[in-house]
Design a protein with these regions (language model features):
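N-terminal signal-anchor/first transmembrane alpha helix
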Residues: 1-29, 107
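C-terminal transmembrane helix and the adjacent membrane-cytosol boundary/short C-terminal tail
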Residues: 2, 9, 161-176, 188, ...
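Amphipathic cytosolic juxtamembrane alpha-helices at the membrane-cytosol interface
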Residues: 4-5, 78, 104-107, 141-143, ...
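Interhelical loop and adjacent transmembrane-helix boundary motif
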Residues: 4-6, 38, 51-61, 217-264
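Transmembrane alpha-helices
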Residues: 12-24, 115, 150-152, 156-169, ...
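Short membrane-interfacial helix/loop motifs at transmembrane-helix boundaries
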Residues: 25-65, 131, 217, 221-222, ...
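Membrane-interfacial helix termini and adjacent extracytoplasmic/periplasmic loops
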Residues: 49, 122-149, 183, 219-223
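Transmembrane alpha-helix signature in integral membrane proteins
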Residues: 64-97
Length: 275
């Protein structure tokens, strides 16, 4: 009885919150993906798998395969992955640079990093049109990539910076005393200590980049539509909520699989470093 009370007191509120605002909405969306769009544009019975067939490119009778959605999904994955990679290349050294500064300068740099959050997201993305148009880069996939990198770079830098501040630099000195080169000492002693922040930064960057539709809609145009644009269009202009729900679950599945693979690889890497 005491254990039940302790559970209700500690985990009960969080469990109720997650159930009401995460599990239940996802369940509703999944049920919508199995329903039929009516003649008046509503969602109703009977249950059907037609929406899922359309998601994977098949018609109702599995006679024709048109992988347009899968091509858009693949484009979304590699664009989001490339944007995340750019955030890693730019943000990882930046986090170390900020951590190496004096306290006063560090606060100033962190403030400059956070200031864009105080400006409306749409205004910041529209500003890139003014920057890129004179160079003939708007609209284009490159413009979308630059916009994503700009938008999500702070989400990568902040968790990595938090990990860098906790690095024990005595391990680097010990590695160098044992004959390791500076590069080898950094890779063996510093990178594993910043791995939690690196994983968190990649997740916080890749997930919103994969599902975004604002950046690609403004900077990319119709030729660079991503899966987020497809979902937004189904729930908006097209009004096909059943099909949009199926697309949403496909996007969710890809995100979860990607996060699982990355976490598994990062965890395996951490175990190898400890060994």
């Amino acid at each position: 009885m005491l254990t039940l009370r302790r559970f209700l007191a500690t985990l009960g509120p969080g469990t109720v919150w997650l159930t009401l605002f995460l599990v239940l909405p996802l369940l509703i969306v999944f049920v919508y993906s199995l329903l039929t769009r009516t003649d008046v544009g509503q969602v109703g019975l009977p249950f059907t798998l037609e929406n899922w067939q359309r998601v994977f490119g098949y018609d109702a009778l599995f006679e024709e395969f048109v992988p347009d959605n899968l091509q858009v999904l693949w484009r979304s994955v590699w664009v989001a992955g490339l944007a995340t990679g750019l955030c890693v290349l730019l943000g990882y050294p930046l986090a170390f640079y900020i951590a190496a500064q004096s306290e006063r300068r560090r606060r100033l740099l962190l403030l400059l990093l956070i200031i864009p959050f105080w400006t409306n997201f749409l205004i910041r993305i529209y500003a890139w049109i003014i920057i890129l148009r004179p160079f003939g880069l708007f609209p284009s996939t490159l413009a979308v990539l630059l916009g994503m990198t700009y938008a999500y770079l702070p989400f990568f830098v902040l968790p990595v910076y938090a990990s860098v501040e906790k690095v024990d630099w005595r391990l680097v000195e010990a590695a160098e005393d044992l004959g390791a080169t500076p590069a080898r000492a950094f890779w063996a002693a510093v990178v594993p200590q910043t791995l939690p922040g690196l994983v968190a930064g990649v997740i916080l960057t890749f997930v919103p980049a994969l599902g975004t539709f604002v950046v690609s809609d403004i900077l990319g145009g119709a030729k660079t539509a991503l899966v987020g644009n497809l979902v937004q269009n189904q729930f908006g202009q097209s009004g096909d909520w059943a099909y949009g729900s199926a697309l949403s679950f496909l996007l969710l599945a890809v995100v979860l699989i990607g996060l699982w693979l990355y976490a598994r690889a990062a965890g395996q890497r951490g175990l190898e470093d400890l060994a």
